[in-house]
């Protein structure tokens, strides 16, 4: 008994609400374990002892995470200790609290509903602290909190979260406006939430929301424009609020007042709203449930799941507004794969039909129907996705037989919305609806519209309305089945999805009273609308097992059938295509391939098809063969896990290349002879219909060669780049462009496979891949530390060569625009290739300290291992020197001075001397042996600038030996004598380091060459041998702010130089 009691007590959590039947999951265990571990570590310690102990402990990755989670647990469960704990965690965190933010984001997304009341309030406090101190990535936590602020929910718990977030946004408005995506999400969410807060008891909250949202929309309208058409749909639901009514007037009347780039309402309506904004209006838990329903529940078994969903989320009157959010999410976000479309999983149209037919609120029902047909109104076949209009036609088509009330309601709504949604631009709306219906027929989503539009189950008034609106679709259509054979391009089913980009169209300003832009929630005509609310018995029978079975039966079109559309689309198309007679040589093998759809029958057909000349086919026959083969090859490819789970096990490797498309690659690998024109045409159409063919071929050759080599170790199997070239020729693209595009697609699809293939790519496509900046960028953007390590291993073992010396500098020059992490990885790879400095040193003058810190850091490390040479010094001193100097050049000179002081001094002196004419007309100065004078040497001012900034870096005499050598002394004296007054004044402290020479030097004699005050030419001639006191020169030209340290350094240098000269004279 005591044991049971202790077990129950152990399960009590301060962070999560736990019922008697709940068990701790891994997340809860992790948080509580980290809290207990932290308490054991810091118990009884003073603040200083705790900080010292934790500072050492966080150096280990695992302990750092445990400590971070432990602190997070305390801040969420103990309000009295929260402030002190926040201070402690800022002191010991070594990742800018990134670990805490990451765990908090996960906690909000996955466990918010289970948090205790105290934890929810502390969460808001912690968010406020994070925003106040601008902690990185806090916007991710905010976005997930916005998702938890559910629509259709006016419970006190939900209202607390909404108002708390609103207060944070108002208080930290400046921070909010720095993140455009968060601005967009906030506006989209609050416009949606305002709709639910019409209760007079919520008037104060609603006014606060309206004031904040309107202000944010007007001041940040350029960020609001990308919200697109669904933002307009939400604005319609709040159009009766005075502030939003005025906003509507500005949008329609005076769009330029909102933003200079805004051209009116049509610009918004032709921008597809991003999936993320549609997603943010569903609770994460609700999203998981509806996604499970659409991906894992079999058609016919869905009723119990729908009943649970109804009781959970549609229990209150306010919750009916959620139906529109769900329908928009299902239509735009849940796009089933080919495998799912061909399976018995409940289709999207059935879920949407249930959401609409079970709605008992007239306004919510009208809004739900608008959500279903919203994309129809602005549909552009060239840019929009057919998956967004498919559910609308299918729910009507499948319901007309057993549930005509659903089809009648939706058809009536479609007819009326086409005419009344935007009266002034009815023609544009009608074009969008016509485009939708036309593409639906062309893509064979349904065979034809007659069973729907001319059904005897529709009342006469509705049939007349349909006839008035869709007259073009009522006459018997042309043989749409033949469309498949009239073009060389195969018809891609609507299952081949592609995302549409944002579109912007322009329109004139519209008069508010003439536009006819209807407000669904405010202008419903109760007398005219057709709203058939089914009985409970009808609701239970909607899309039941019996209906599902009936929908699968095959009937003739004259029998008013709608059942074919529940079959996989590919089977429907094949069944409805007219039989085409083919040449005897391929008829049998083609039929076998169409029936069995496997690699064996496919390769047998290719063997028969390849040698056939163009004369063996009529055009419609070739089109028939091509369209069917492309469709089957596409549909037989798996949508997920297309690559092998293992890179070593033969079973997994062989299975991953067992699909028919790989049969084509195998056939090409084993047959090198030239193909006839029909086969080339087939190959070209396959390339167009399956964009992934390029990287799948590369993957196939890697696996195939690996497996064949294992089977027959006596024979070597290698990549055949000729096959890839054949694919590129079929696609009519250059091999370099094809390779980059395919590798880019592969990296986005599966980074591990991309990196696995990388050594083979660089080996087999050496001329294209080596020093290729685009390929390098694709590689660098996806690698982490472990990947960099593996790449370095491959380079060290000679398996991978990414760079060659010739042309590498151009590659590095282009990489200067890469992200910081990418550049650091790049320099590690360059270093692994043992590239000599001479191959890349010419870029040194181009590097800027502010723009290229990564490259300069690496060059500095390279220079530490090199001796100074004339060429390197010339390039370094050619760098532009800013007012504060060039720390890169100064650093290099400092560490070279420690080992190569005399050599460095001579090289720089030679460069400086070469900028001035010879002092004696009868003598010609020559640089020391081994030092050549380049035509692209730095200017005298550049050299003097760098020497001056180097001098300033010297303190207490350290590093000043550079100036005491004879050549440097003579160079500085020569520079001084040939400089104008402004230059002498600018570098007076530098020139002061040059010691004056005695009148005679050694045995040769001659006039002494000393530094002189600036004077006229006459003065120079008359006093050529006079000596000037260095201190006097210094007094005339030095600046007033020289420090005592600099004076001490210069004095020491002068003394050293004089001693060296005296020693030289004595030796002479």
UniProtKB/Swiss-Prot annotation:
Q: Where in the cell is it found?
A: Nucleus; Cytoplasm
UniProt keyword terms in alphabetical order: Cytoplasm, Nucleus, Phosphoprotein
Superkingdom assignment: Eukaryota
Q: Known InterPro entries for this protein? A: HEAT_Ints3_C (IPR056518), INTS3 (IPR045334), INTS3_N (IPR019333)
Q: Which GO CC annotations does the UniProt entry carry?
A: cytoplasm; Golgi apparatus; INTAC complex; integrator complex; nucleus
Q: Where is this region: Disordered?
A: 916-939, 1000-1068
Any Pfam family: Ints3_N
Q: Which residues carry this modification: Phosphoserine?
A: 1038-1039, 1043-1044
One GO BP: snRNA processing
| Its job | Component of the integrator complex, a multiprotein complex that terminates RNA polymerase II (Pol II) transcription in the promoter-proximal region of genes. The integrator complex provides a quality checkpoint during transcription elongation by driving premature transcription termination of transcripts that are unfavorably configured for transcriptional elongation: the complex terminates transcription by (1) catalyzing dephosphorylation of the C-terminal domain (CTD) of Pol II subunit Polr2A/Rbp1 and Spt5, and (2) degrading the exiting nascent RNA transcript via endonuclease activity.
Similarity annotation = Belongs to the Integrator subunit 3 family.
> Subunit structure of this entry?
Belongs to the multiprotein complex Integrator, at least composed of IntS1, IntS2, IntS3, IntS4, omd/IntS5, IntS6, defl/IntS7, IntS8, IntS9, IntS10, IntS11, IntS12, asun/IntS13, IntS14 and IntS15. The core complex associates with protein phosphatase 2A subunits mts/PP2A and Pp2A-29B, to form the Integrator-PP2A (INTAC) complex.
The entry's protein name is Integrator complex subunit 3
Q: Which organism is it from?
A: Drosophila melanogaster
């Amino acid at each position: 008994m005591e044991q049971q009691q202790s077990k129950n007590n152990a399960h009590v959590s301060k962070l999560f609400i736990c019922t008697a039947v709940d068990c701790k999951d891994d997340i809860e265990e992790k948080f509580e374990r980290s809290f207990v571990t932290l308490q054991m570590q810091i118990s009884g310690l003073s603040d200083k002892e705790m900080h010292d102990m934790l500072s050492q402990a966080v150096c280990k990755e695992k302990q750092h995470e445990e400590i971070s989670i432990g602190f997070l647990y305390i801040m969420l469960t103990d309000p009295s200790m929260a402030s002190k704990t926040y201070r402690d965690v800022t002191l010991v965190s070594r990742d800018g609290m990134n670990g805490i933010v990451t765990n908090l984001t996960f906690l909000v997304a996955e466990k918010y509903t289970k948090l205790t009341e105290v934890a929810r309030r502390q969460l808001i406090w912690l968010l406020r602290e994070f925003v106040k101190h601008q902690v990185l990535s806090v916007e991710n936590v905010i976005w997930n909190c916005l998702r938890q602020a559910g629509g259709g929910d006016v419970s006190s718990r939900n209202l607390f979260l909404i108002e708390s977030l609103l207060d944070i946004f108002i208080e930290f408005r400046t921070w909010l406006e720095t993140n455009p995506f968060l601005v967009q999400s906030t506006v989209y969410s609050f416009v949606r939430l305002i709709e639910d807060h019409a209760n007079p008891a919520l008037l104060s909250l609603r006014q606060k929301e309206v004031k904040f949202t309107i202000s944010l929309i007007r001041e940040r309208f350029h960020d609001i424009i990308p919200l697109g058409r669904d933002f307009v749909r939400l604005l319609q639901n709040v159009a009766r609020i005075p502030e939003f009514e005025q906003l509507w007037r500005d949008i329609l009347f005076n769009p330029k007042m909102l933003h200079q780039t805004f051209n009116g309402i049509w610009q918004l309506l032709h921008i597809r709203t991003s999936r993320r904004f549609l997603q943010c209006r569903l609770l994460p838990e609700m999203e998981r449930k509806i996604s499970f329903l659409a991906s894992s529940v079999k058609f016919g078994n869905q009723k119990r799941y729908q009943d649970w969903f109804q009781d959970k989320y549609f229990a209150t009157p306010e919750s009916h507004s959620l139906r529109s959010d769900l329908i928009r999410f299902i239509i735009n976000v849940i796009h089933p794969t080919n495998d799912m479309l061909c399976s018995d999983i409940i289709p999207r149209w059935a879920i949407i039909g249930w959401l609409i037919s079970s709605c008992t609120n007239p306004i919510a029902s009208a809004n739900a129907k608008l959500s279903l047909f919203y994309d129809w109104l602005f549909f552009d076949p060239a840019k929009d996705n057919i998956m967004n209009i498919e559910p609308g036609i299918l729910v009507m088509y499948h319901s007309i037989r057993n549930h005509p009330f659903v089809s009648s309601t939706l058809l009536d709504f479609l007819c009326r919305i086409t005419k009344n949604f935007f009266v002034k631009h009815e023609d544009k709306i009608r074009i969008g609806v016509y485009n939708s219906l036309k593409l639906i027929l062309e893509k064979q989503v349904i065979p034809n519209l007659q069973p729907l539009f001319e059904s005897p189950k529709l009342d006469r008034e509705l049939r007349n309305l349909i006839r008035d609106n869709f007259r073009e679709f009522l006459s018997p259509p042309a043989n749409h089945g033949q469309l498949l054979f009239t073009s060389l391009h195969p018809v891609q089913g609507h299952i081949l999805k592609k995302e549409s980009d944002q579109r912007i169209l322009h329109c004139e300003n519209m008069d508010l009273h003439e536009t006819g832009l209807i407000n669904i929630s405010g202008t419903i005509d109760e007398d005219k609308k057709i709203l058939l609310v089914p009985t409970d018995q009808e609701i239970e029978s909607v899309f039941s097992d019996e209906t599902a079975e009936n929908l699968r039966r095959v009937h003739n079109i004259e029998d008013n059938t709608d059942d074919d559309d529940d079959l996989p689309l590919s089977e429907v198309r094949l069944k409805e295509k007219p039989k085409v007679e083919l040449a005897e040589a391929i008829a049998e093998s083609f039929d076998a391939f169409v029936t069995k759809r496997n690699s064996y029958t496919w390769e047998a057909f290719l063997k028969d098809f390849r040698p056939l000349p163009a004369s063996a086919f009529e055009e419609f026959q070739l089109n028939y063969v091509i369209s069917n083969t492309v469709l089957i090859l596409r549909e037989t490819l798996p949508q997920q896990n297309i690559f092998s789970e293992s890179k070593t096990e033969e079973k997994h490797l062989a299975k991953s290349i067992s699909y028919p498309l790989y049969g084509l690659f195998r056939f090409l690998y084993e047959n090198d002879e030239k193909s006839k024109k029909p086969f080339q045409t087939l190959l070209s159409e396959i390339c167009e219909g399956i964009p992934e063919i390029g990287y799948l071929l590369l993957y196939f050759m890697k696996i195939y060669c690996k497996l064949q080599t294992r089977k027959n170790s006596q024979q070597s199997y290698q990549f055949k780049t000729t096959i890839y070239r054949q694919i590129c020729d079929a696609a009519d693209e250059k091999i370099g462009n094809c390779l980059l595009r395919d590798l880019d697609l592969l990296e986005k699809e599966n980074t591990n496979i991309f990196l696995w293939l990388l050594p083979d790519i660089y080996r087999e496509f050496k001329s294209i891949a080596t020093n290729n900046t685009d390929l390098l960028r694709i590689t660098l953007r996806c690698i982490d530390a472990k990947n960099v390590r593996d790449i370095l291993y491959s380079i060290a073992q000679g398996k991978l060569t990414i760079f060659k010396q010739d042309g590498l500098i151009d590659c590095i020059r282009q990489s200067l625009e890469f992200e910081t992490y990418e550049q650091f990885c790049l320099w590690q790879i360059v270093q692994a290739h043992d590239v000599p400095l001479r191959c890349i040193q010419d870029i040194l003058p181009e590097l800027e300290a502010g723009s290229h810190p990564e490259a300069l850091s690496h060059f500095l490390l390279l220079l530490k291992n090199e001796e100074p040479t004339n060429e390197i010094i010339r390039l370094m001193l050619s760098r532009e020197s800013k007012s504060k100097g060039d720390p890169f050049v100064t650093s290099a000179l400092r560490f070279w001075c420690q080992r190569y002081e005399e050599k460095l001094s001579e090289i720089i002196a030679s460069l400086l001397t070469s900028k001035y004419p010879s002092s004696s007309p009868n003598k010609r100065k020559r640089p020391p042996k081994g030092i050549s004078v380049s035509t692209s040497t730095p200017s005298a001012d550049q050299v003097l600038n760098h020497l001056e900034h180097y001098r300033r870096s010297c303190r207490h005499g350290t590093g000043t030996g550079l100036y005491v050598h004879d050549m440097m002394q003579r160079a500085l004296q020569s520079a001084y004598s040939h400089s104008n007054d402004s230059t002498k004044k600018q570098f007076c402290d530098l020139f002061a380091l040059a010691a004056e020479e005695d009148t005679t030097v050694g045995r040769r004699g001659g006039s002494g060459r000393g530094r002189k005050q600036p004077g006229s030419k006459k003065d120079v001639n008359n006093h050529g041998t006079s000596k000037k006191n260095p201190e006097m020169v210094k007094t005339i030209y030095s600046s007033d702010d020289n420090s005592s340290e600099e004076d001490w350094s210069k004095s020491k240098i002068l003394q050293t130089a004089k001693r060296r000269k005296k020693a030289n004279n004595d030796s002479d």
